[in-house]
Amino acid sequence: MCGIIGILGKRCVTSSLVESLKRLEYRGYDSSGIATVHNGRLYRIRAEGKLVHLEEKLQKTPLKGNLGIGHTRWATHGVAVERNAHPHVTERLAIVHNGIIENFVELQKELIEDGYTFETETDTEVIAHLITRALKSGLSPQEAIRTSWKRLQGAFAIVVIFEGEDNLMIAARSGPPLAIGYGKDEFFVGSDAIALAPFVDSISYMEDGDWAVLTREDITIYDVDNQPVKRPLTPLFEGALLASKGNHRHFMHKEMFEQPEVISHNLAHYLDLGNYTVRSFQKLIDWKKINRILFASCGTAYYSTLVARYWFESFAALSVDNDVASEFRYREPPINSDVLSVFVSQSGETADTLASLRYCREYGVKTATIVNVEQSTMAREADFVLPTRAGPEIGVASTKAFTCQLATLAAMALDAAKQRGFLAEQAEHQFVQQLAEVPRILNEVLKLDNKIEQICRNLVNVKGVLYLGRGTSYPIALEGALKLKELSYIHAEGYAAGELKHGPIALVDEAIPVIVVAPYDRWFEKTCSNMQEVAARNGRIILITDKKGAEAVHLDILSTIVLPNIPEFIAPIIYALPIQLIAYHTAVLLGTDVDQPRNLAKSVTVE
């Protein structure tokens, strides 16, 4: 999985396919490949590793054809070797795929019983054989795609070309994004605008459930009900390759909705989702030699490390210190060889965090950095780099980078526990399965977008907001308060729920809403007691909980945001999304500049 490109034109498409794949490298990959149709025949070349290896093969064996597809893959099902690289080819078609097919084992068994042979370990090959079987039954390519699509469970975006069809490409989207590009005498399909920017004049974004039939003469998009639809065209120019909001009003909204996909990319990097195990960090970090972790970060990244503290201490029995990077150097903490210092930053350029990293390096301490920009200064200077793979984040208020930081830290904590002998095999499978469910659950939460917008109408005229959380929900409450401050300019404070009676309760009245982050976990009953205290003082409560929590609360609640029931381990990642949506919609209702809030910068490069 990772990046998709398809081109249908009147000239050889090979060089444009490779150029587009280069523009998708930021998404991360471990193999690549392209396939073309020339004189009705399918041709394919794939390579393990970087794109330069694919280019070397193409120099030796050039591919012809004015119709082709390309792919950069991060291994999910199947190891990172050439045979598992995309495109996958049968005697009837070539296909590229982004996503995960959840029922591929069941479908694979069915196809094997039907006489099909599998050459790879990937879930994508199941799609290829399903469509091929449908074609052999006499269905048209369009009918074969639709019939096969109905059998698939999971999230996927696919682009397919066919043997014997020099003028046909079909794309389908169920989850991961796909954009259609309109160039001069050429049509394109790609994972995002970045891949298409040099070649097209405008793009349209396929919506979830759409599928598209492309010929040189026309493009027809069908919706989930198989009805022809028109999707809005967005002008695109080279300088705006990062400046497309798609069908969203703001970059922040787009980036919140990208979280299911980018977290699936992240998890594929750190987890073996086929075997439900953690990919070992041992080549980077020998956890048996580590007795203490020191986190230093700023803002939202700092809150991600506060969540991680619970994970590392409870799973791996490691002592954890959390510091705001801007204060870290001033207290001169004692550090030695058994300490791992970890620095989290979206940009990898945050001045205070970078200065803290350099401080630790001066003392010979091992340094690891969790960054979204892999070419950043912090990535170059740290001993170990753990990329979040969230993709470009344009909105100043971090959303998808934050949840990808949490996902990275969760995998890191599981690996530490495993290496140190505190994580049994069965428990490892259980926790990895829980993480694997995160993209699906986030998609469910995104369906609450309109409801949350309505709830936020209660916040537009308030003088302040309190956020409460307990356990791993406490850092999420802190992040919620920060987001609301950043975007809406409403004063907001986050507190540990147990601290309410130690001062903040003095603020509680009808004018100060209290947003409570309270999944139904081992701390839920105690948090309910805090809500009782708020209700007794006529406080207005907005409760973010799950179905069990909503049923257990018998209070006069202003509004309740009900999420799916989920395990405690992954709750911080899931509950981050509704607090982002609250901040976003409140800011939109107030008319503030959501993507570029006043006085804030995406990358803080001064101390």
Curated annotation (Swiss-Prot):
Transmembrane segments: none annotated. The active site is at C2 (nucleophile), K602 (for fru-6p isomerization activity). Residues 277-422, 455-597 form the SIS domain. The gene is glmS. Pfam families: GATase_6, SIS. This is Glutamine--fructose-6-phosphate aminotransferase [isomerizing]. It comes from the Bacteria. Catalyzes the first step in hexosamine metabolism, converting fructose-6P into glucosamine-6P using glutamine as a nitrogen source. The keyword Repeat applies. It is found in: Cytoplasm. Homodimer. Residues 2-217 form the Glutamine amidotransferase type-2 domain. GO terms for biological process: carbohydrate metabolic process; fructose 6-phosphate metabolic process; protein N-linked glycosylation; UDP-N-acetylglucosamine metabolic process. Signal peptide: none annotated. PANTHER family: GLUCOSAMINE--FRUCTOSE-6-PHOSPHATE AMINOTRANSFERASE, ISOMERIZING (PTHR10937), GLUTAMINE--FRUCTOSE-6-PHOSPHATE TRANSAMINASE (ISOMERIZING) (PTHR10937:SF0). It is an enzyme of class 2 (transferase). It catalyses: D-fructose 6-phosphate + L-glutamine = D-glucosamine 6-phosphate + L-glutamate. Coiled coil: none annotated. InterPro entries: GATase_2_dom (IPR017932), GFAT (IPR005855), GFAT_N (IPR047084), GlmS/AgaS_SIS (IPR035466), GlmS/FrlB_SIS (IPR035490), Ntn_hydrolases_N (IPR029055), SIS_dom (IPR001347), SIS_dom_sf (IPR046348). Keywords: Aminotransferase, Cytoplasm, Glutamine amidotransferase, Repeat, Transferase. One of its GO terms (cellular component) is cytosol.
